[in-house]
């Protein structure tokens, strides 16, 4: 049985709510249902354009959840200030483009290295763990290690869009390299029941972040049932 943790991203609950600019579905209620059905932590992405999650959502979740909050943000001064006020268990730094539908790829840690040094140091000052969302690439992992990041999250989008052995091998290689460099390894983006079960089998990956697929499934089956089924899919993967 796999002990890989499941992080449920609830951004698109807010997307549905914001479609009519109302106060339902309540994001805290949905998060708590996910937790009661096996979610080990809750993830939200506070984007600069606030297209789904709003500032108030983040504070409400932090004050209400009985599991850790993983806050995804772009590495900007505004977002740093918010993260310090919220004090989530973990901040995951992601790249952002205004016109993208979703995060399109990993953070270029090497390119942003000089800026990220002080950014990560400040988060660590407030005992906030730092994860960097990156492509499954050993050079990016090396840079993350130099920055003293606690974890990386491997972008699985390319594998999910093109489920070849070559793409899977990149994830496997990167996860093993994380172990060698003594940096935590998570994975996420584009995962469904089948691909999550496969990625959960990869040695040294300790957590998966899954959002859009689960929210879509919840329209048909409810958030509790969908999270429970995902938890079972992950647990079915052998250690």
Curated annotation (Swiss-Prot):
Protein name: Pyridoxine 5'-phosphate synthase
CDD domains from the UniProt entry: PNPsynthase
Positions that bind 3-amino-2-oxopropyl phosphate: 9, 20, 190, 211-212
Pathway: Cofactor biosynthesis; pyridoxine 5'-phosphate biosynthesis; pyridoxine 5'-phosphate from D-erythrose 4-phosphate: step 5/5
Reaction it catalyzes: 3-amino-2-oxopropyl phosphate + 1-deoxy-D-xylulose 5-phosphate = pyridoxine 5'-phosphate + phosphate + 2 H2O + H(+)
Feature type site, description Transition state stabilizer: 153
GO CC list: cytosol
Keywords: Cytoplasm, Pyridoxine biosynthesis, Transferase
Top-level division of the source organism's lineage: Bacteria
Subunit structure: Homooctamer; tetramer of dimers.
Disulfide bridge partners, by residue number: none
Xref: InterPro entries: Aldolase_TIM, PyrdxlP_synth_PdxJ, Pyridoxine-5'_phos_synth
Family recorded in the similarity comment: Belongs to the PNP synthase family.
UniProt-listed GO biological process terms: pyridoxine biosynthetic process
GO molecular function, a single term: pyridoxine 5'-phosphate synthase activity
The enzyme's E.C. designation: 2.6.99.2
Location of the active site: 45, 72, 189
Pfam families: PdxJ
Function: Catalyzes the complicated ring closure reaction between the two acyclic compounds 1-deoxy-D-xylulose-5-phosphate (DXP) and 3-amino-2-oxopropyl phosphate (1-amino-acetone-3-phosphate or AAP) to form pyridoxine 5'-phosphate (PNP) and inorganic phosphate.
Catalytic class of the enzyme: transferase
Residues that bind 1-deoxy-D-xylulose 5-phosphate: 11-12, 47, 52, 102
Gene name, Swiss-Prot/TrEMBL: pdxJ
Gene3D superfamilies the record matches: Aldolase class I
């Amino acid at each position: 049985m796999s002990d890989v943790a499941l992080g449920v991203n609830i951004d698109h609950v807010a997307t549905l709510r914001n479609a009519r600019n109302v106060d339902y579905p309540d994001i805290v209620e949905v998060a708590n249902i996910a937790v009661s059905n096996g979610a080990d932590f809750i993830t939200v992405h506070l984007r600069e354009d606030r297209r789904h999650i709003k500032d108030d959502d983040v504070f409400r979740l932090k004050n209400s959840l009985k599991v850790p909050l993983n806050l995804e943000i772009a590495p900007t001064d505004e977002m740093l200030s918010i993260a310090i006020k919220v004090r989530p268990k973990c901040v995951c730094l992601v790249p952002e483009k205004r016109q993208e539908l979703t995060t399109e790829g990993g953070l270029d840690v090497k390119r942003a290295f000089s800026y990220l040094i002080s950014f990560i140091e400040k988060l660590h000052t407030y005992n906030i763990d730092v994860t960097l969302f990156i492509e499954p690439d050993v050079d990016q992992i090396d840079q993350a290690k130099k920055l003293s990041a606690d974890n990386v999250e491997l972008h699985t989008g390319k594998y999910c869009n093109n489920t070849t052995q070559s793409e899977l091998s990149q994830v496997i290689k990167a996860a093993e390299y994380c172990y060698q460099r003594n940096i935590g390894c998570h994975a996420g983006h584009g995962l469904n029941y089948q691909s999550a079960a496969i990625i959960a089998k990869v040695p040294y990956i300790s957590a998966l972040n899954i959002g859009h697929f689960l929210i879509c499934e919840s329209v048909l089956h409810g958030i509790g049932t969908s999270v429970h089924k995902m938890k079972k899919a992950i647990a079915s993967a052998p250690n």
